[in-house]
Design a protein with these regions (language model features):
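Beta-strand-rich luminal/extracellular ectodomains of secretory-pathway glycoproteins
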Residues: 3-4, 40, 55
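Juxtamembrane interface at the cytosolic side of transmembrane helices
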Residues: 1-8, 157-194
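Short, aromatic-rich amphipathic segments at membrane interfaces
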Residues: 126-171
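Long, solvent-exposed extracytoplasmic domains/loops
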Residues: 45-144
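Alpha-helical transmembrane signal-anchor/signal-peptide segments
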Residues: 27-46
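C-terminal TM-helix exit segments that contain a strictly Trp-centered aromatic cap at the helix terminus
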Residues: 19-29, 179-182
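Intrinsically disordered, low-complexity regions enriched in Pro/Ser/Thr
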Residues: 37, 56-58, 157
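Hydrophobic membrane-insertion alpha-helices, especially the h-region
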Residues: 7-23
Length: 194
C-alpha cells in the first residue's frame, strides 16, 4: 500500500509539473504574440497622450465629469498590453472631444440642415435618393469602439498571460512539493517500520 501511495505522489508531482510547464510555455507564447501583433500595427502615441496635455485639451473642449487617463504613451510605440489599454483610454477622450462630449447613444441618428441632428427620419436631411442622411459624427464612435475593443483585448490577453505564468509557477512548485512529500513522508515511514 505504501508503494502505491508513493508512486501516486510521484505521478501527481509529474502531472502538476507538466501542467505548470505547459501553462508557462503557453502564457509566454501568448504574451509574445500580443507584443508582436501590436508592434506590427506601428501604433505610436500622439504628443497629447500625457495626463497634463489631455487634461488641457479636455478642458478646452469643455469636457467635464470625464475620467482622464493617468498613464502616458506620448511618442512611444504601443507594443504591450498596458500601453494598448492606455492608448485606448486616450482614444476615448479624443472621440468625446470630436463629438462635443457626447457618446454614440447620446447623438442623434440622422443629420439635419441646422447641424443639430434628429432621430426622426422625416425631419432628417435627405440624400440624392430621398433617404435620410446618417449622422456622420456617430461614425467616430463606431471606429473608436472597434479600435478600443481590439486594444483592450490585447490588454486582456497580456494580463491572462501574466496570470498563466503565475499559475504555471504555482503548479510547478506544487508538483515539487508533492514529490518531496511522497519521498520524505513515505520513505520515512518505511524506514521507521523496518
Amino acid at each position: 500500500m505504501r508503494r502505491l501511495l508513493e508512486y501516486g505522489g510521484y505521478a501527481a508531482a509529474v502531472v502538476l509539473v507538466a501542467f505548470g510547464i505547459g501553462a508557462l510555455v503557453l502564457s509566454v507564447n501568448g504574451k509574445s504574440t500580443v507584443k508582436d501583433d501590436l508592434s506590427q500595427e506601428k501604433i505610436v502615441g500622439s504628443p497629447d497622450m500625457t495626463p497634463d496635455a489631455i487634461a488641457a485639451e479636455a478642458q478646452k473642449a469643455g469636457l467635464s465629469g470625464v475620467d482622464l487617463p493617468s498613464c502616458s504613451v506620448a511618442g512611444e510605440q504601443v507594443d504591450t498590453g498596458s500601453e494598448a489599454r492606455c492608448f485606448a483610454e486616450y482614444m476615448h477622450i479624443h472621440a468625446l472631444e470630436a463629438t462635443g462630449g457626447k457618446t454614440y447613444a447620446e447623438m442623434p441618428r440622422f443629420a439635419t440642415e441646422d447641424g443639430k441632428g434628429t432621430n426622426d427620419p422625416a425631419q432628417a436631411q435627405k440624400d440624392a435618393n430621398g433617404q435620410p442622411v446618417s449622422n456622420a459624427a456617430r461614425e467616430i464612435w463606431v471606429t473608436e469602439t472597434a479600435l478600443a475593443t481590439a486594444l483592450n483585448t490585447a490588454y486582456m490577453a497580456d494580463q491572462l498571460g501574466n496570470f498563466g505564468i503565475v499559475v504555471g509557477i504555482a503548479l510547478i512548485l506544487a508538483g515539487i512539493g508533492f514529490a518531496v512529500l511522497a519521498w520524505t513522508a513515505l520513505r520515512g515511514s518505511s524506514v521507521r517500520a523496518d
